[in-house]
Amino acid sequence: GYCGMTSKTSFVDKKALDNDYNFYWVYPYVMGADGNRIVGKSPAYVYAKGICASVTNLKAASQNGAVKLTWTKSADAEGYLIYGKTESGKYGYIGMTSKTGYIDKKASKKEWNFYWVFPYYKNADGKMIVGQTGKYVYGKAK
């Protein structure tokens, strides 16, 4: 069905399904002399599941005995999952927060600590829907 209209080159579907694929066709239009829209063809479609956008401005700063992570809020996120690893360690879950920052008090002073931050929200069924991460950051505890 109809999703929305915009004069811009992007559109955010706030009602996208998170448990199934959403299909989108974009139709260009011009206004006719009579004031009616003349709709063009849509040569292709795209599809995706509804998730939160990646966090932006992810940064790591060394602190005494810790590494402090900060980022800009992801639209519609209820919280953030923090994953990481040291140079020689295994990738895994570190913690979660509803804020736009996290302090890893178990960060290594000897090795680089690598961090990924994933935004999430809970759908109507209470299921956690996890978004993507755009990049990673790294730091060492002082």
Could you say what each language-model-derived stretch is?
Residues D18, D34-D76, K109, A124-K142:
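Pro/Thr/Ser/Gly-rich low-complexity, intrinsically disordered linker/stalk tracts
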Residues Y2-S7, Y93-K99:
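Short beta-strand segments within Ig-like beta-sandwich modules, predominantly Fibronectin type-III
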Residues M5, K15, S62, M96, ...:
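Conserved strand-loop elements at the edges of beta-sheets that form or border functional pockets
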Residues G1, W25, S74-Y93, W116:
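Extracellular low-complexity, O-glycosylation-prone stalks/linkers
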Residues G1-L17:
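Low-complexity/repetitive intrinsically disordered segments
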Residues K14, T70-T72, Y83, K105:
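Beta-strand residues in well-ordered beta-sheet regions across diverse protein folds
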Residues T9-F11, T100-I103:
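Short strand-edge motifs at loop-to-beta-strand transitions and within beta-strands
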Residues D13-G35, D104-K127, G131:
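Beta-strand-rich modules
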